[in-house]
């Protein structure tokens, strides 16, 4: 039996009120659908630690700054429901766009600082769309805990900052990035790669991990990043939008003694791929 699909907000809120009245905890996994093993790992984590699990499926138009990317984003609701069936999801919330954003919707939530570099510099307005929809979904679902993958590292830091600054009563639970056998981070957009492109894409994580290893071994950061850039270009991956070492929390300049993160965004077959890896600075 597929996961029960709930569309009207009033119906979801009625379910949530019943659960809350019994003191049950609610775990939420926000998604845009086109589910893969990465999403399912978040659902399993929610199932293991919460009494009730809601998966949200909403392709948020406000976080796309490219209309073609929005139009091409995979929409596979029935397949998604079937994938969730064995995982014990209590509700697959698929709201109508007009219920999330009525015609007179006028509120935008913007988080500064952590959103400025990397994705923020290349996708204007993207993080405003993310912050706004995440806040809406937390309110709609009554989330006690929300589960986010570390693949979208900058998004994870945004959500943490959002919850902290707005004093939202939601615990943010980070979950490890899930990778294919060749190391490529799982993403709904990967299915748009050609067979040849999918093979070449394995060079992205391989190059990223090698650059991280070199930096941890003491190589100058600029030298390691230049070699990684050359490696990506040699593999036919590009253009590279960014390949940067950043502080793991603030995404400012990395500091000795603090966790750092190496992040990349690059194009292949007309598909934008992102990835990141932890780096220990000594």
Swiss-Prot record:
Regions that span the bilayer: none
Ligand binding (beta-alanine): 63
Binding site for ATP: 32-39, 149-152, 178, 186-189
CC terms in the record's Gene Ontology section: cytosol
Subcellular location(s) of the protein: Cytoplasm
Domain of life assignment: Bacteria
CDD domains reported in the protein's UniProt record: PanC
Paired cysteines (S-S): none
Catalytic function, reaction form: (R)-pantoate + beta-alanine + ATP = (R)-pantothenate + AMP + diphosphate + H(+)
Main location: cytoplasm
Sequence positions that bind (R)-pantoate: 63, 155
Molecular function terms from GO: ATP binding; pantoate-beta-alanine ligase activity
Keyword field contains Nucleotide-binding: yes
Enzyme Commission number: 6.3.2.1
Active site: 39
Cited Pfam families: Pantoate_ligase
GO BP annotations, alphabetical order: pantothenate biosynthetic process
Nuclease is among the record's keywords: no
Entry keywords, A to Z: ATP-binding, Cytoplasm, Ligase, Nucleotide-binding, Pantothenate biosynthesis
Pathway the protein takes part in: Cofactor biosynthesis; (R)-pantothenate biosynthesis; (R)-pantothenate from (R)-pantoate and beta-alanine: step 1/1
NCBIfam families associated with the record: cyt_tran_rel, panC
Membership in a protein family: Belongs to the pantothenate synthetase family.
Subunit-level organization: Homodimer.
Stated role: Catalyzes the condensation of pantoate with beta-alanine in an ATP-dependent reaction via a pantoyl-adenylate intermediate.
Note: The reaction proceeds by a bi uni uni bi ping pong mechanism.
Protein name: Pantothenate synthetase
Organism (species): Paracoccus denitrificans (strain Pd 1222)
Lineage of producing organism: Bacteria, Pseudomonadati, Pseudomonadota, Alphaproteobacteria, Rhodobacterales
Gene: panC
